Amino acid sequence: MIKAFSSEVDPGSREESASKKQPAAAEITEDGFLGGQLRLRQPKSGHRAGHDAILLAAATPARSGDRVVDLGSGVGAAGLAVARRVRGIDLVLVEIDPDLAELARNNAAANAIKAEVVILDVEAGAAAFDDAGLAPDSADVVLMNPPFNDPSRHRASPDGVRQRAHVATATTLAAWVHVARRILRSNGQLALIWRADGIAEVLAALDRGFGSLEILPVHGDATAPAIRILVRAVKGGRAPTRLHAALLLNEESGVPNKWVQEVLAGKGELPLARR
């Protein structure tokens, strides 16, 4: 059994947390997100947070008082971005890599965001989740950015952390969705991001136990196929699936989409976040 380690970060302990030893991994950079509202320390190489995490956060339908679980949180970018947008959530960051989990803990403290950090393999069994305080029917919202690159078309990185964070196996998505279904309460909300050409995999994984799907395709520009899909699903939902108008990261002229830039700067949310 994989042992889970859980620790809670309280905003009042930010100075003490910041003084703790950082992971002895590669060089660390400090980067601004949400227009500088969120400062995150992360490895200079390997798996780094970017637009995917912030778009996922902007699509997460959380409300104040919700228990929100970020599966595979990395350094905490998506979950902490949700907490910055929606005050008063009970945030849990779940990450398998101890170094990234330590960065997530310090990032939460440095940004004065209260969060529980759990070191746990998302594909661990139910008993490991119970031990970590993530029992069945205990979460209101789950968000996740699982590894989604197709191994048959993507050369795996020699960096083990990067490979684990980016390359999916044949069972990755189904396993992560199964965990979300188990820990969510009835009518709980799931938000996820996946590569657009894998939409059939997403629909298949959500077919058992989820409904009321809302799908938002993300395009680099209007002339190219979608590169990502953002999906919101409801545990036990029965409403018909809705396909939203495409989100264009850049206009046809190549200029960044102004509304998307506002969302990335923390000045707005995506339609999937409204409930």
Language model feature labels by segment:
Residues 104-105:
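Conserved SAM-binding loop
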Residues 128-141:
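A short acidic, Gly/Pro-enriched loop at the edge of an enzyme's catalytic core
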Residues 75-88:
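Conserved SAM-binding loop of SAM-dependent methyltransferases across substrates and taxa
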Residues 225-275:
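SAM/dcSAM-binding transferase cores
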Residues 25-63:
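Class I SAM-dependent transferase core
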Residues 45, 49, 170-226:
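Conserved Class I SAM-dependent methyltransferase catalytic core
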Residues 65-74:
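Conserved class I S-adenosyl-L-methionine
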Residues 146-175:
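Mobile active-site "lid"/loop adjacent to the S-adenosyl-L-methionine
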